[in-house]
């Protein structure tokens, strides 16, 4: 038989073990609202649950829920009413809006469940955390609102109009759960996914999440975001219990756990601002509450937008980059030419010559240069020699024929003055008599005659009466003996296509094709259509490397500049792959110790270090401890050990559903449970006059634990 002393020691041990639990304190942001500032509060509703008010994905950038329906009402179960007006009214639930809400930094204190040390809970049937705060705070300096008192059922005035947000994170180890019961709106996001959706003013509703069913990876960190709104009288009940090991890894400059700097108002930023600059809120990790002195000035670099044909400048009013007005990208170096700019064809190029004349359009005979802004004509066939007769042969250049000076006297030397063009016939001294028989000539040939040699009458000279050589290799020079006239016939070149006329090269005498479609732009590929139309297409500068920007400039040709790959977030490193282009990889954050895990967090603004989580094989029964000195994880049993973790021998010792003395099996354990069977023992204990524990209501023997602890005495074990 157990002695009375032993009974007392057992009872005392159980009582102390229940009361010595640890608390967890979580910072929360509560925004005081009012029906006077937001019509979504005290809105008519039939006290029923409405799902779908928020979208299934959290806005990751500021960790806020996204309203479902834009400028439309939220869905409702009541055809005559709605529960949210629009995205504008919803915005002030979880964002600071001066005059509409008042942010209040507060905290929730979670108690540890003694049945299961992993579980922490928060519960109150009267959840009014900001009574006499917010708009009613004596220190509130904003515009006062004329709000009536809203009374509870027991005729006490409370603040029934507020929204709360709590942010944390956790390393998933397995077996975690989250349970909620309460009113009104509640949304829970894990890893940015909506896992609990209890929308609209309603009576207390329950929801649970088994994290093992969410596809999470053990040892990986995940965000946890909790949103709660009280929007209607006359109750405010909340109960939360969870085995998720939530932690606040950092606080932003607003004092919010894992916040995104929502309290920042760029209109309050202080500093030197350039004419085209604008303020941006600082990253959450600046480590100071003086955010207004740490704002980041953003100024657009408009030169990055410049193209070959357009330059940009910043508009100081709109603070955006705009094209410069009245700026001609094609500055004329020659006022006789017209240029246009084409992004596709590589910049400025000549499209039209102002110096043009139909009479002087043959480029083989004429040039039309622009000199000091004036068009001039250069006649290529004109030479100063008066003894040369020059003409233009269209398409074949210049013909230069010598003036014929002949007196048909073999005793004279015939010449021409290049200055005056006058013929001279100088007599040869001691000219020898001519042997007419020897040097007889054909008088009918007017191109060539045979004359005696004035210096040697035993020989004759063949004299050209007409010199038809015009000095142009692109003509066939022929003298007609009957008439003595020259024919300088152009070389005939075969036509290749409808655009490009062939012509003879005066230097070589050979036919060449002059590219009439050549626009003198190295950034265009020129071709000719069947109908004789010139076609100019953009030159293909693609080098096959996806890490280069390939383009053409009229003064250079193809250019291949390296592209700049920008990362999508502070936690990604951008690089370039010649086959794939820009790619990203996660940034590697260095850790300073074995028991610290370095991770990059976008919300934090970069790398941060957290305590390493050691994952036991059975998280329900053990917890891990990291040792920097040994660089190992060790695991220890929870003390007291939850009933589900007890050995078979201990569990077998539970007689009739009672627990062996000294083993914590529930929040309310009486000594009589060790002496009597489960139900019989409990009934006997309850029948004892005035024998009640203050904690017995927390976890009664025959009711499930509201704090997620397993009650092994819920049913008597089979006999």
Curated annotation (Swiss-Prot):
Residues 112-260 form the PA14 domain. InterPro entries: Fibro_Slime (IPR011874), PA14/GLEYA (IPR037524), PA14_dom (IPR011658), Prespore-cell_inducing_factor (IPR051154), S_mold_repeat (IPR001673). This is Protein psiJ. Glycans are attached at residues 46, 59, 86, 113, 301, 372, 435, 457, 562, 628. It is a single-pass type I membrane protein. It is found in: Membrane. GO terms for cellular component: extracellular region; membrane. The chain crosses the membrane at residues 654-674. It holds the Pfam family Dicty_CTDC. Residues 675-719 are cytoplasmic. It comes from the Eukaryota. The keyword Thylakoid does not apply. Residues 1-21 form the signal peptide. The keyword Signal applies. Keywords: Glycoprotein, Membrane, Signal, Transmembrane, Transmembrane helix. Belongs to the prespore-cell-inducing factor family. Residues 22-653 are extracellular.
């Amino acid at each position: 038989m157990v002695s009375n002393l032993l009974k007392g020691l057992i009872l005392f041990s159980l009582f102390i073990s229940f009361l010595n639990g640890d608390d967890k304190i979580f910072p929360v942001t509560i925004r005081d609202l009012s029906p006077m500032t937001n019509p979504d509060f005290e809105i008519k509703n039939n006290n029923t649950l409405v799902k779908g008010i928020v979208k299934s994905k959290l806005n990751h950038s500021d960790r806020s829920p996204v309203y479902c329906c834009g400028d439309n009402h939220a869905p409702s179960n009541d055809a005559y009413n709605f529960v949210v007006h629009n995205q504008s009214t919803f915005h002030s639930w979880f964002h600071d809006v001066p005059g509409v809400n008042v942010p209040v930094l507060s905290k929730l204190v979670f108690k540890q469940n003694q049945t299961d040390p992993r579980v922490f809970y928060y519960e109150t049937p009267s959840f009014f955390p900001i009574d006499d705060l917010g708009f009613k705070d004596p220190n509130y300096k904003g515009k006062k609102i004329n709000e009536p008192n809203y009374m509870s059922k027991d005729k006490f005035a409370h603040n029934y109009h507020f929204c709360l947000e709590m942010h944390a994170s956790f390393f998933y180890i397995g077996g975690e759960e989250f349970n909620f019961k309460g009113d009104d709106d509640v949304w829970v996001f894990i890893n940015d996914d909506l896992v609990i959706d209890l929308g609209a003013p309603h009576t207390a509703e329950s929801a649970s999440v088994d994290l093992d069913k969410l596809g999470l990876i053990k040892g990986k960190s995940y965000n946890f975001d909790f949103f709660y709104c009280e929007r209607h009288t006359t109750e405010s009940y909340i109960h939360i219990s969870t085995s998720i090991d939530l932690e606040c890894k950092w606080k932003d400059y607003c004092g919010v756990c894992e916040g995104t700097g929502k309290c920042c108002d760029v209109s309050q930023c202080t500093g030197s601002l350039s004419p085209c600059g604008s303020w941006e809120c600082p990253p959450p990790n600046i480590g100071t509450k003086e955010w207004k002195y740490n704002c980041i000035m953003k100024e657009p670099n408009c030169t990055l937008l410049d193209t070959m044909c357009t330059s940009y400048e910043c508009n100081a009013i709109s603070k955006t980059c705009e094209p410069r007005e009245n700026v001609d990208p094609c500055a004329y170096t020659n006022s006789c030419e017209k240029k246009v700019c084409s992004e596709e064809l590589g910049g400025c190029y000549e499209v039209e010559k102002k110096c043009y004349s139909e009479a002087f359009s043959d480029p083989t005979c004429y040039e039309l240069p622009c000199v000091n802004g004036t068009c001039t004509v250069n006649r290529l066939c004109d030479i100063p020699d008066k003894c040369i007769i020059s003409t233009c042969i269209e398409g074949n250049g210049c013909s230069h024929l010598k003036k014929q000076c002949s007196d048909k006297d073999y005793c004279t030397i015939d010449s021409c003055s290049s200055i005056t063009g006058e013929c001279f016939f100088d007599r040869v001294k001691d000219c020898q008599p001519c042997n007419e028989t020897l040097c007889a000539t054909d008088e009918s040939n007017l191109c060539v005659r045979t004359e005696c040699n004035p210096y040697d009458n035993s020989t004759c000279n063949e004299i050209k009466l007409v010199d038809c050589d015009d000095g142009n290799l692109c003509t066939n020079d022929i003298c007609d003996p009957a008439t003595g006239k020259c024919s300088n016939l152009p070389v005939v070149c075969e036509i290749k296509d409808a655009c490009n006329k062939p012509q003879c090269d005066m230097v070589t005498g050979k036919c060449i094709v002059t590219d009439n479609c050549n626009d003198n732009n190295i950034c265009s590929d020129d071709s000719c259509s069947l109908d004789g139309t010139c076609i100019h297409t953009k030159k293909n500068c693609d080098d096959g490397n996806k890490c280069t920007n390939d383009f053409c400039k009229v003064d250079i040709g193809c250019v291949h500049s390296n592209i700049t790959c920008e990362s999508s977030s502070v936690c990604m490193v951008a690089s370039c792959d010649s086959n794939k282009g820009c790619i990203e990889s996660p940034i590697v954050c260095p850790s300073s110790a074995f028991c610290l895990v370095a991770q990059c967090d976008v919300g934090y603004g970069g790398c941060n270090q957290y305590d390493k989580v050691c994952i036991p094989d059975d998280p329900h029964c053990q917890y891990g401890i990291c040792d920097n000195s040994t660089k190992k994880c060790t695991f220890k049993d929870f003390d007291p050990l939850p009933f589900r973790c007890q050995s078979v021998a201990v569990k077998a010792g539970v007689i009739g559903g009672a627990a062996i003395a000294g083993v914590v099996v529930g929040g309310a354990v009486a000594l009589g449970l060790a002496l009597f069977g489960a139900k019989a023992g409990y009934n006997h204990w309850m029948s004892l006059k005035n024998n009640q524990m203050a904690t017995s209501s927390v976890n009664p023997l025959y009711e499930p634990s509201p704090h997620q602890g397993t009650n092994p005495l819920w049913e008597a074990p089979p006999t």
